[in-house]
Every structure is written in C-alpha cells, then in structure tokens.
C-alpha cells in the first residue's frame, strides 16, 4: 500500500479544481495585458542573504517562516517567501533597474512556514505587480486602481480599500524614537507577541490583532503626526485623486506592511464576504529597496494578491469549463489514422476536439460523447475511411440530432463553411 501523501501545508490541485484557477488567472492576465504590464519570471530558489537584506532580519517572514537549507556547496538557500526581492535582484543583476520605468508582473508559488488554514498554505501562489522607476503620485493611484479593478473584474464583493502613509525614512525614524519611548512605559500592558516585537520590528505592533493591545495603542504616538510637509502633501493628493476616481477608501493609521522596505503609501484591500474582514491584496511604495540591495536609487511601488484566498472568494461561474466542440468517434485501422489527421486539422480552428482513443464499440463511444455534452460528433468507420470522408452531426440541447452532413477529408472549404455556420459563429477564421 502506498502511504505517500503531500506534506502538511501543501495541496494537490486536481484537474476539476484547476478549471477555476485557470479562469481566474486568465482574467487577471488579460487585465494586466490591457494595462501594459509585462511578465517577469524569477527562480523559486534564491540565496538566503537576498531575503535577509531585502525583507529585513527582524521581520516574522525572515525570523520564523522561511524554508532555508544548505546546499551541497554549503551555500545557504531559501525557497522564496515573496516575489519583490527576487524581482529587484533580477533587475540589478541584468542591469535593467536603471532603464526607463517599467511595469512588471509575476505569478507563482511562494513558501512560508505558517499554520495552515483555509486560504493559507505553506506553499501558496501569489500574483505580484511592480511598477519600477515610477515616483509620481499618479503611479500610486494607478497601482491601487489596477488592484481594485482586477478584484472587481473577478466579481469579488464587499471590497474595502484601506490606506495609510508610512512617510519617508526620516519621518519613520523620528516616529520610531517616540514610539519606543512610549513602549518602554507601556510594555507590560501589551500581549507577549507584541512585547517580543519591540526589539526586532516595533512598527509591526501597530498591526496587532490582539484586542487588548489594540485598545492600549489608542494612546500611542501616531506616525501621521511625524510626517514632513512633503510626505503629508503627497498623502493628501492621493486621497483627493481617489475621491475624484470614486474609489471609496478608509484611512487606517495603524496599517503597516509586514516587510521593512516600505515607505510612503501603504494599502490593503479587504472583503467581508468570508465572515470577517479578510485581506485580499496588500501593497505599497518601496523607494529604497533596490538601492538597499546594491542597485541605483530607484523609486517603486507594487502589490501582491494571494491566489488561494482569491479562489475561495470567486464565484462558481468561474468553475465552468469550455464544452467539447467535436467528439470524434472512430473504429477500424484506416478510420483511426483518418480520425487523427482530422483532429489535428480541426484544432487549428480553435475548436475543443476530443478524439476517442479507446477502440471501443460505436455505441460506447457515443455514450461517452453524450456524457461530455459535445456539441457535435464526427463518425468515421472503415467504410467512411475507404471513401476518405466522415459524417458530422450537430446536436440540440436534448441530444437530438439537429443536422447531419457527409464531408470529404480533402474538402477544406466545405468543412470550414460548416464550422463557421454551426460552431464558431462569433469568430473570424
């Protein structure tokens, strides 16, 4: 007996489940293409130092969640826990971080050692979008609206946009000094997890889920009060432009991103359709990341969407697959070759063609075609093969025959006319 099973926190995506995944991915990629965002693909495996420097050693991701190991060359390697650091590395390595501004996207598996739950696995899939070399407020607006539009296009309901500004590094440094002083006084009132964050990543305390700590934080200094005039002006312009675009938002001054490289704009999009407010998308500006990793000073902003949670949120209509256009029933040595030849020809018309490979009786093949709800059936026996022709039948919804025609395998004009008339009326061949 085979006792092998997938590891905890990993999931097999079976063919029926992947229909929904593929439909969701198709909609996302179409939206990105229409927004002139180009794909980039980076390795799943990177040097550990990349994430320590890019994400920050004090973050939960680096300190608790990474899958790290030594390879046979005694090099420390890590399965990527997120995609932005890898994109930044690729841009620096290939000398394209200094090129004119570019819009990039990636989609693929990431790895974090977390407690598995619905919509969150240890191997998970993430969509990331990065606008590299963009500094203007308008790039902040476009990245937010792009994320919003993708989620709306997928039919996600009850969307809420939360925004905040983290200021620049000077703003954050001034705030952090005041916040640390406040934490010293109030440390014992905080939950244990927040107490542990004080030395490593104090800003993450602002994002606590602990109810008691949330209440205590109401008396803490606000980062907003430490913003420079320039940072505040940028934030006010973003709010005004979102209002003009009629994109509703909520200001959340405790919203901080979990990674060290963020500056200025931070945002999350949540939904209440899962019973409580669940984050669907998170993003923000990270103007210092590329220089922090050894590249030139390069402004950038991006967002990420976890696909597992997105799939749960998407409606059942995205589970629908395209029906089989033609099922080819065939029996006999000569008929099999003709059927294979014909199936290849028909697929060039962007038709979904199922070629029966069973060699079973005609009646069994017809039953399978009916089960698949094929729009039409082609019948080829040795009698038809000798004449180099086939019979094609178009069916009604109740499986009764609508029309039937015999066509020569060499009569491309007649075949094309039949296809145009009966199967792809709305397509240009």
UniProtKB/Swiss-Prot annotation:
One GO BP annotation of this record: histidyl-tRNA aminoacylation
Main location: cytoplasm
Alphabetized CDD domains for the sequence: HisRS-like_core (cd00773)
PROSITE patterns linked to this entry: AA_TRNA_LIGASE_II (PS50862)
Keyword Hydrolase listed: no
Reactions performed catalytically: tRNA(His) + L-histidine + ATP = L-histidyl-tRNA(His) + AMP + diphosphate + H(+)
GO cellular component: cytoplasm
GO molecular function list: ATP binding; histidine-tRNA ligase activity
One Pfam entry name: tRNA-synt_His
Family assignment from sequence similarity: Belongs to the class-II aminoacyl-tRNA synthetase family.
NCBIfam families with a match to the protein in the record: hisS
Protein name: Histidine--tRNA ligase
Organism: Prochlorococcus marinus subsp. pastoris (strain CCMP1986 / NIES-2087 / MED4)
